Amino acid sequence: MAEQVTSARATAKIVRVAPRKARLVLDTIRRKSVNEAYAILKFLPNTSTEDIYKVLNSAVANAENNFSLDREDLIVKEAFANEGPTLKRFRPRAKGSASPINKRTSHLTIVVAEKEAK
């Protein structure tokens, strides 16, 4: 007796955007329909929207191709950004010293699921 699959996920690893900045965008699309999320991402000025758009596209494609779910019935069930590896750089300063610069990366995950019938 196979259980009906109602969700699909997509992940992007080591994306060159700070997790804190990615979370600002992910918080706006969480619990929205997929079409509404696309519209929001299209008009937000944040630089992380392009990477998040790609991950959302991949999650929707996984739902359609792997589980035969209808795109119109999908919502963004989960969307989160975890911390990836940090690129450590140095900025030269006065008197031969240097200050550390941390270039942060993220692991983006989006889960889409079918709307629950009321």
From Swiss-Prot:
GO cellular component terms?
cytosolic large ribosomal subunit
In terms of superkingdom, the source organism counts as Bacteria
Question: Sorted alphabetically, which InterPro entries does this protein's record hold?
Answer: Ribosomal_uL22, Ribosomal_uL22_bac/chlpt-type, Ribosomal_uL22_bac/org-type, Ribosomal_uL22_CS, Ribosomal_uL22_sf
A molecular-function term among this protein's GO annotations: structural constituent of ribosome
Query: Which region is the signal sequence?
Result: none
For biological process, the GO terms are: translation
Keyword list (alphabetical) reads: Ribonucleoprotein, Ribosomal protein, RNA-binding, rRNA-binding
Question: What is the documented function of this protein?
Answer: This protein binds specifically to 23S rRNA; its binding is stimulated by other ribosomal proteins, e.g. L4, L17, and L20. It is important during the early stages of 50S assembly. It makes multiple contacts with different domains of the 23S rRNA in the assembled 50S subunit and ribosome.
| Record family assignment | Belongs to the universal ribosomal protein uL22 family.
Describe its assembly.
Answer: Part of the 50S ribosomal subunit.
Q: What is this protein called?
A: Large ribosomal subunit protein uL22
Q: Which organism is it from?
A: Leuconostoc mesenteroides subsp. mesenteroides (strain ATCC 8293 / DSM 20343 / BCRC 11652 / CCM 1803 / JCM 6124 / NCDO 523 / NBRC 100496 / NCIMB 8023 / NCTC 12954 / NRRL B-1118 / 37Y)
Q: Coding gene?
A: rplV
